[in-house]
Amino acid sequence: MDCYTANWNPLGDSAFYRKYELYSMDWDLKEELRDCLVAAAPYGGPIALLRNPWRKEKPASARPVLEIYSASGVPLASLLWKSGPVVSLGWSAEEELLCVQEDGVVLVYGLHGDFRRHFSMGNEVLQNRVLDARIFHTEFGSGVAILTGAHRFTLSANVGDLKLRRMPEVPGLXSAPSCWTTVCQDRVAHILLAVGPDLYLLDHAACSAVTPPGLAPGVSSFLQMAVSFTYRHLALFTDTGYIWMGTASLKEKLCEFNCNIRAPPKQMVWCSRPRSKERAVVVAWERRLMVVGDAPESIQFVLDEDSYLVPELDGVRVFSRSTHEFLHEVPVASEEIFKIASMAPGALLLEAQKEYEKESQKADEYLREIQELGQLPQAVQQCIEAAGHEHWPDMQKSLLRAASFGKCFLDRFPPDSFVRMCQDLRVLNAIRDYHIGIPLTYSQYKQLTIQVLLDRLVLRRLYPLAIQICEYLRLPEVQGVSRILAHWACYKVQQKDVSDEDVARAINQKLGDTPGVSYSDIAARAYGCGRTELAIKLLEYEPRSGEQVPLLLKMKRSKLALSKAIESGDTDLVFTVLLHLKNELNRGDFFMTLRNQPMALSLYRQFCKHQELETLKDLYNQDDNHQELGSFHIRASYAAEERIEGRVAALQTAADAFYKAKNEFAAKATEDQMRLLRLQRRLEDELGGQFLDLSLHDTVTTLILSGQNKRAEQLARDFRIPDKRLWWLKLTALADLEDWEELEKFSKSKKSPIGYLPFVEICMKQHNKYEAKKYASRVGPEQKVKALLLVGDVAQAADVAIEHRNEAEMSLVLSHCTGATDGATADKIQRARAQAQKK
């Protein structure tokens, strides 16, 4: 244990810092780091190097090379730089490389050197060029801030949603500031810059002079400044060799340190741990690394090579041509277990487990000591927590064995934390492997989340490892394996050296019907790569037509899209394709396409009936569909024509169409309608009143109501209205007029073809019982009982029913008898029924 703490360095009385090697770099750099533009992504991210030929003379023919490596030095990409001079490099939160050029254009590259997009930082930059730039991260995304040759600042807080903000001018700024950085306060990005002994804070509205509280006197300029990983703290390096540390709001001073070095440092970054009260800053010169904080002494390291610092959530990565190291504050759990002469519960439990392996009785002594103090649960938890913060698997195993050993003597210790730590460490050890090169710490891993880690493995095309992690952690398929397989398939379609058939087959064999995988998304990626035929083959595996059709339309495969939409049975989808086809094809080709798709043609006709009547007529004409064409002209005659002549002409066209369709009934009916219209116009001219657009029956009724009985009868003869129907019409009309005398004459004009019960019913409907009784006596025997009941003559109805010996009629009469007035009648019927039953 003493040996294990050999690389621990105390900073004051309450904190230790250690630096250990992550990787031995084997990237075979041809240039020194000082001769390159360098950018390293946080959270164990990749490293980008661009030899800067614009600051050092090189042969005119030589082009700079942009190289991207993993954190372990494994090459990921290398490409010749063919664009303009680059001022700064930086990584976005999505691990995209942002290259800021002098002309203000920012080029965005993927992890494997694939060009993604570009954007400009404004027109002003074209004239004044970019002097310096910073890439920073906020809760909204990754931002870019630039300093132009006019000594003005422009920034965008989110390159994914580019909104440029030109910051206010700094008064009296005639040259570039000695140092500057971005500060995020209250969810807004600011610029903090130093001009001589003065500090200025720029926001979108104003430029404010600020003064660090408690700053040592004699400062004439600030040489370097650094903001902490979480933007909560700020460090300033002055020309007097002092380092001021305080809050980023510049309202509170934390501490100050005199490093007795006035030379400006190459880099200065914060080194802090989440939930730690200690605050420290790491300062790097050419061959010296210094850790300073709220302590009278500093920690110093000698740098054998040119090195680069990468601030992290819980420490600082330091890499050079040969090594990649991690410098951080020793976590509390590790400190309590491993520091010399520690009597912490975790330290005693670790010793107990080691003695147990040696089969020594000291194991029992250590264990009893912990149990007597009631600290065994705390000891187990300390060992579990410390294991998470250890980089080397052997030490992780030792601590976890100790925790497992202690758990055996506890009845109710929840196993979740132990199991979860074992899983997390197995994942961390897998991704820390040299060939993977993602040296995440436990704190970084928890902050990043497993989903983001999987996304980063996918970005590196490490699909098998990502799938193994998903299966090991038993993540839901849609969030884990399915999502990764979908990414793999999207990458697979970009492999242009493999045939479309082979790629489609390989993707289908791997994915099958995996839930959560959208073949249409993969097909869209294939189409974006210029592989239309592959996209079509992939869409064959997509079970949802609603996902197939939009992409087929985008690929200008409209006829195939129509077939798929029809197969789906989704009428809305079919309409979508039809409207697209209508705009895409000429009229003839469009109609020809419809003729080959009966369902689509039927739906389009329905659409045209409501929206495009002329198109509907063209469809019927093209198909020689005279029956529907006739129906169309009939509807059109009433919908569009107001003049009687135009309406008759349209009906004549309809009749001709019906004759061509060999539908003589429809043709004759149409001709009858034309005759009726002409007659109605003549009646209006001669009699006045409203006749047009009345039906034949209503026309007859109107004539009767107007007293034009002869005209009504003539109309009935002309249009061959049956006698029964004419009698009904006349009966109803005369009753409505309450012309009872004329009604009686009409009833006696000849024998009624409808009988006389309707006369009784109509009179009773008009509440005229007197007239109804006149016709009740004329009703035939089979309807006599019903007629008598209608006029309320229950006794006579009973006599007729008894005379007829009709059981149904007697029951009907009984149902109309009331106890008070018709008791005798009811008894009479009952006696008749009884006599009938005896016989």
Curated annotation (Swiss-Prot):
Pfam family name, one: Vps16_N
3'-nitrotyrosine PTM sites in chain numbering: Y4
Any one cellular-component term (Gene Ontology): HOPS complex
Entry's Gene Ontology BP terms: endosomal transport; intracellular protein transport; vacuole fusion, non-autophagic
Subcellular location: Late endosome membrane; Lysosome membrane; Early endosome; Cytoplasmic vesicle, Clathrin-coated vesicle
Molecular functions per Gene Ontology: actin binding
Chief localization: membrane
Record-linked InterPro entries: VPS16 (IPR016534), Vps16_C (IPR006925), Vps16_C_sf (IPR038132), Vps16_N (IPR006926)
Topology with respect to the bilayer: Peripheral membrane protein
Assigned keywords, A-Z: Cytoplasmic vesicle, Endosome, Lysosome, Membrane, Nitration, Protein transport, Transport
Subunit structure: Core component of at least two putative endosomal tethering complexes, the homotypic fusion and vacuole protein sorting (HOPS) complex and the class C core vacuole/endosome tethering (CORVET) complex. Their common core is composed of the class C Vps proteins VPS11, VPS16, VPS18 and VPS33A, which in HOPS further associates with VPS39 and VPS41 and in CORVET with VPS8 and TGFBRAP1. Interacts with RAB5C. Interacts with STX17, MON1B. Associates with adapter protein complex 3 (AP-3) and clathrin:AP-3 complexes.
Function: Plays a role in vesicle-mediated protein trafficking to lysosomal compartments including the endocytic membrane transport and autophagic pathways. Believed to act as a core component of the putative HOPS and CORVET endosomal tethering complexes which are proposed to be involved in the Rab5-to-Rab7 endosome conversion probably implicating MON1A/B, and via binding SNAREs and SNARE complexes to mediate tethering and docking events during SNARE-mediated membrane fusion.
Family label: Belongs to the VPS16 family.
Protein name from the UniProt record: Vacuolar protein sorting-associated protein 16 homolog
Gene: VPS16
